[in-house]
Amino acid sequence: MKDTIRQLIQQALTQLVNEGVLPEGLTPAIQVENARDKTHGDFASNIAMMLAKPAGMKPRDLAEKIIAALPADENVTKAEIAGPGFINFFQNTQALASRLDAALADAHVGVRKAGPAQRTVVDLSAPNLAKEMHVGHLRSTIIGDGVARVLEFLGDTVIRQNHVGDWGTQFGMLMAYLQENPITSDELSDLENFYRAAKQRFDESPEFADRARGLVVKLQAGDAECLALWTKFKDISLSHCQKIYELLNVKLTMADVMGESAYNDDLINVVNDLKAAGMLVESNGAQCVFLDEFKNAEGEPLPVIIVKADGGYLYATTDLAAVRYRSGKLKADRALYFVDQRQALHFQQVFAVARKAGFVTHPMEMEHMGFGTMNGADGRPFKTRDGGTVKLIDLLTEAQERAYALVKEKNPTLADDELRSIAKVVGIGAVKYADLSKHRTSDYSFNFDQMLNLEGNTAPYLLYAYTRVAGVFRKLEKEYSEVDGQIVLEAPQEHDLAAKLAQFGEVLNNVAEKGTPHTLCTYLYEVAGLFSSFYEKCPILTAETPAQMQSRLRLAALTGRTLKQGLELLGLETLERM
């Protein structure tokens, strides 16, 4: 609907230019927002205030001329001036109802992508292997997954890339420790304790540390025995990750793994190509790139280190190889990097070097989708009581146990297997939603009591809201698709719910553009609240007429489909009853 209004305004502006009211050459970004006060319209634009100065007119006077020049459209009943020069638009209620009827009949709930479909790389999760995933890996994994799901739903070809840290010193440590302490495969499956013991030896023994580094050199040189051990450690570690992904209901598989090791053979080519481009400069024995746009507080250029003084490569080298692969081989139009926002400078530099070096051969937009940190209830980094890192599996297990206690208290007569099944959906959903509902760039404090609350913007509230809709259709023994009739909007609660449901496509396109799933969370919470008001004020099964009942059932069906689809795009499972 906003696009329709923008087009109407653009046509009016073109007419005013032709009439000499507006000067030629104006290219304003026409903004249309949802009106806050529905008594003054459904949408509002500040275009008259934006163009008043170049037009040499008062905003309200220009607004009058814009309204007079607006073409007639069946979707808009009228336009009015408000305040200092806002133009408020009232949408045609019947046209709105017809759009919702069409959305209910559509497999994509009437949602379409605002622009052309693209090939989009989503770089997400990317844990360092050789140890278990911890809470610090949660945000990249689930925010990236949510945005990837939305992009796919809108029609993009999404290529997930799990850029795991599967190369480096940690594997030398493990190999050196295994040489000292041969163990069985079963014992090795407890990788966390094995890694902890190896790290302790590495920190305490210089001789052990030297041996570990020597094994890394042998590994990088292709030593068969080292490669075999590395493969074993890597496979065990990836299997741990895969269990977490499946528990989190995240769409990542082994086929999506493209770790640091995958780019090893291209690193020397990256160095040689930068050298050939005249971009490499030696600084303190290291090979670096200096770019004028990146300087320190003293105004000196900051180095992007490509090769260390000891000949080793860094993250920047591998990331440059990855950029070239994603552009040249994958032919991506867009690459989204879901990595901690503390890496912002790193990615700014990598992207700039890649463009200058000509590594982006296929036009590819690169965006660092940085995010804040998850903290404990005290606002400090989330740790165990003894100050250690919290393992992700432990956090998710506790979430399920807490949800189980909550569900059992509310439903003491349910069978235990059903309680466990519901608790898994509620517990995992609560952890994910608590994260996804926060702005991506914000830090937030992890709080089990808040996220498992049945009131407020939480997963349990939304899951329960969906079961209320599902319950209506369960009573009727009908599917959402089996409701005949047409939507007719009479009561204010019907109109408010309908107007919100019509915004689903706009919200999803916003998530796809900005990588901000919290806007989808807010939208679903608002839909649930409006459905609650509608459900209380507009009886469905005891409606006054059969036609009214069918209309309200259709509104409920579209609400159910929207909530279910929205939660699925966030990676949350739904329940038919709680």
Curated annotation (Swiss-Prot):
Q: Which GO terms describe its cellular component?
A: cytoplasm
Which GO molecular function annotations are given, in alphabetical order? arginine-tRNA ligase activity; ATP binding
Q: Does the keyword Ligase apply?
A: yes
InterPro entries in the record: aa-tRNA-synth_I_CS (IPR001412), Arg-tRNA-ligase (IPR001278), Arg-tRNA-synth_N (IPR005148), Arg-tRNA-synth_N_sf (IPR036695), ArgRS_core (IPR035684), DALR_anticod-bd (IPR008909), Rossmann-like_a/b/a_fold (IPR014729), tRNAsynth_Ia_anticodon-bd (IPR009080)
Give an example GO biological process.
arginyl-tRNA aminoacylation
Note one Pfam family from the annotation: Arg_tRNA_synt_N
* Subunit structure, interactors included: Monomer.
Q: What's this protein's name?
A: Arginine--tRNA ligase
